[in-house]
Amino acid sequence: MKRLTVISGAGISAESGMKTFRGSDGLWNDVPLEEICTPRALIRNPRRVMEFYNDLRQKLEHVQPNEAHRILAEMQDSYDVNIITQNVDNLHERAGSRNVLHLHGELTKVRPMDCYTESDGYSTRYVQDIGYRCVREDETGGPGNTRLRPHIVFFEEAVPNLEKAVDTVMQSDILLIIGTSLQVYPAAMLHTYAPYGCRIYIIDPDESPAGAIHGVTHIKKVATEGMREFKSLISNIV
């Protein structure tokens, strides 16, 4: 069974109604990211940060996976599918995908502010799945009973799952990049770890930096339309 690795970004969830962070109508156009998505912002104004993510979490509850998510889940019957997502939503999982690695965290989870250690990184023992409920800025948890924070990788923070993501890409037979402009590092360089002979596809209606790489197939369509074409293109690669 061929190993299909997927690197997904906000574009795959946009058709479900999840607003992207970047782009002409992105969230960062409404709220400066340095006021919301940095460790300093969390310390300076925890209420604003928690309210921002509470609002996103409540919106997530009312959106559904779209056809692109569902096709990827269905492809697990024919391929060893591993998804590396930059998205913090849970739409891949709700569509039925089993192997999903979140690079930038998860909206439906929180963790204590003191659960990071130099030896273990983020201790998953203290990460809590809260579903879609709102979290107050003064809620506490963990062994130190410290304030809870969104289980989100903020700007200026390390990406704990990066090494796992690189290892996954290095073992790929087919690499699909969908819904990401490849502007956010270190995720933007993951495709460079694809092994020799790996077939690389991009689904993005706009130009992509990776699209200029020799041998890359660029499907210039939105996620749902592009996934239909992609599934057909690789149907003979099993």
Regions found by a protein language model. Name each.
Residues 1-238:
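Conserved catalytic core of sirtuin-type NAD+-dependent deacylases
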